[in-house]
């Protein structure tokens, strides 16, 4: 927000210079982005009057004038401005004057005619970019007065960044309140005298959306002169705030917006059919806006309508049909309180960002509308004339924001600030902020002012007290902290350790958005309902992720589109699953996921080009699981997942509970996502693995190990892992290692069966095993496999 320093000082005028004022505003939490003079550096320019104006005898576009600047004679000045005329009060640079850019005014002859000065435009004085003509001053401007003094050009434009919680500072009144509080000065508000109704004209107003519009004020003003010029003082204040003068009616509403922070709008009353209806738009309803563009409205957009059509987007932009124009004689002034939620995001949807929507999205003082209406009515009648009707007030008290009542405890205040502020000082600060304060024992009860809807909880009051007291006044004290050795459970497995392992295996960590495209997510998790955001950054980021796969697969596509075909990435982060049993109805699980695709190895002259397969990723995953000490308790089971290939995927179970999936992306999903080639993914619920099994030290056998190989024929649907587990269970005391080293299908093995070649490592810690014992254990394993899986030894 930009504003004039002199305008601010009309409300509150602390005895500090501009730099100190800017620093004070910054320290109050309203960061000053810049302080710029409102005009260039110049001197020797005074108010003058064009007494005579005649055509230059030797030039069609020049005029010869005689100008009174209050001296003992009239000055001859040649001027080329098209608006130069007799009787006009102007800004005159006299001989010896120096204009911006070190331009010195000297006596000269222009096309044979003497010129003893220059009639100046706004651009020539560095005031604005307007160079269409010379400055036209009011007829009562005192001749001979220094123009800097008359236009109050010894002023600065201050630009501040207003945080979303301080919407009350989007008007001069809000900044002035803060400056007054910080300097313990009274706030000098302009006198706003209610304008009595001189006519009975009204319009019927109906509010059909009270949740979106809690208060709507309307007032008819008849017989205005819309072509009346806006006073120079108002134009200058608007200009110094970065707003261009348009016409008197619009300038008045903009002035009130800047002064009080209350958006207003003026309708051409004669173009309103029937009356005003505040309602939600009909789906697909259209409205031609003031800038000539057509907006197609959604059913959640608030509109101001008459009995036949929409006239304006409520709190955002007016419509062309009902806008004020050169023929307007009667207007309806609108001043309303729209709830922030009913405005937020609607302007952005149509590519708009207006001063009104900026304020309504952040919140407007719900007690301000009557004051703003009276201020606008008074200014409008003073400038344009006319007669005002009564104020029409439609208010729904039930939906108006209520002022918060907050209890501030002394213990909380001292603990958060780390410094004791006297009771009477705390009370004084809260009252100067506009709170209604009741003192209690070691506490204060404060009712927040209507304009401070960001005051809701105790911490808000602590922040306000510290801010006004001054952060610089809180003494620095070293933090007293004893050095206590932290405890560490050996069973805690750091996620950082797992990340290091994956890095060592060639993976790179990525971080993707928690917001994802709901359409893509639905492809990966069909039929699963996700949490949708009410105000998303974009449609493609409007759902909370159900897994990390959505972001990881998008990252793979992004890399493949840039000729990076060998990708190994992983991510850890939260997923958000709807769960009625969880707080707020959403369960947040910490997940670890990874993706690989492309060649198994980097390109090398001595390595074959082989594409990664299921077992590459499963091997990496087993390395991660091995860190947890739970690998022996993990099972990989064939289980359907709509995102994975049915024949090249597995569910991961730990002690009978599913903790994740691993597999090749389903070919259909691969096609829809534009993935280039086979892509493999895994995902684990990390919280179920973080508590690792601490390895127990065991005696290392000094006796020789014995290997025996067996080949068993089993049905095709028998998982090899079950065969290995059964061998371990049967030979628990002597079998120290079981490994699958070959799978065979073909000649000698019936169709629907497979041959598994297994090595058994047998060893004892106390003695050398005899051949009979070894043979007995192997036979025991074979018998167990035969009983459970109908396995037979292969010939």
Swiss-Prot record:
Binding site residues for Mg(2+): 454, 460, 463-464
B5 domain boundaries: 401-476
Cross-referenced SMART domains: B3_4, B5, FDX-ACB
Keywords annotated in UniProt: Aminoacyl-tRNA synthetase, ATP-binding, Cytoplasm, Ligase, Magnesium, Metal-binding, Nucleotide-binding, Protein biosynthesis, RNA-binding, tRNA-binding
CDD domains assigned: PheRS_beta_core, tRNA_bind_bactPheRS
Chief location bin: cytoplasm
Statement: the UniProt record of this protein carries the keyword Ligase: yes
GO CC aspect terms: phenylalanine-tRNA ligase complex
All residue ranges annotated as the FDX-ACB domain in the record: 701-794
Cofactor(s) named in the record: Mg(2+)
Cofactor note: Binds 2 magnesium ions per tetramer.
Catalytic reactions on record: tRNA(Phe) + L-phenylalanine + ATP = L-phenylalanyl-tRNA(Phe) + AMP + diphosphate + H(+)
GO molecular function: ATP binding; magnesium ion binding; phenylalanine-tRNA ligase activity; tRNA binding
Location of the tRNA-binding domain: 39-148
Compartment(s): Cytoplasm
InterPro entries per the UniProt record, alphabetical: aa-tRNA-synth_II/BPL/LPL, B3/B4_tRNA-bd, DNA-bd_dom_put_sf, Fdx_antiC-bd, Fdx_antiC-bd_sf, NA-bd_OB-fold, Phe-tRNA-ligase_IIc_bsu, Phe-tRNA-ligase_IIc_bsu_bact
Quaternary structure note: Tetramer of two alpha and two beta subunits.
PANTHER family tied to this protein: PHENYLALANINE--TRNA LIGASE BETA SUBUNIT, PHENYLALANYL-TRNA SYNTHETASE BETA CHAIN AND LEUCINE-RICH REPEAT-CONTAINING PROTEIN 47
Family per record: Belongs to the phenylalanyl-tRNA synthetase beta subunit family. Type 1 subfamily.
NCBIfam families documented for this protein: pheT_bact, YtpR
The protein, known as: Phenylalanine--tRNA ligase beta subunit
Species this protein is from: Shigella dysenteriae serotype 1 (strain Sd197)
Taxonomic lineage from the root: Bacteria, Pseudomonadati, Pseudomonadota, Gammaproteobacteria, Enterobacterales
